[in-house]
């Protein structure tokens, strides 16, 4: 988030913000071939549930005001307003290479 100098230097923790974590099966969709995404490389439910719960535990350890979450695998309707101008994409394969 922007600081007083309009630089992206502040975290949600710095600002006393909360977080909403929603599991999303479409998070891993390979679009390299064809017109439809492939989810073959996405984690299967037992591993995915463990990863989701580990992520929630880590979010709770970060000191945010609060961390709310949905139910893994549930059909949920979520309304949000993105405050852009950008979206951050994290590629765990790239992070692991560092």
Locate the predicted segments by residue.
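Short, acidic Gly/Pro/Ser/Thr-rich loop/turn segments
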Residues: 27-29, 95
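Glycine/charge-rich, flexible interdomain linkers and switch-proximal surface loops
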Residues: 4-19, 68-81
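Short, low-complexity, polybasic intrinsically disordered segments
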Residues: 83-98
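Short, glycine- and charge-enriched coil/turn segments that flank and shape catalytic ligand pockets
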Residues: 4-5, 61-66, 96
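Compact, glycine-rich, soluble single-domain proteins
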Residues: 1-16, 29-41, 46-58
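Short conserved catalytic/interaction loops centered on acidic-Pro-aromatic/His motifs
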Residues: 36, 66-69, 98
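Short, conserved loop-to-beta-strand elements that form functional interface hotspots
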Residues: 49-79
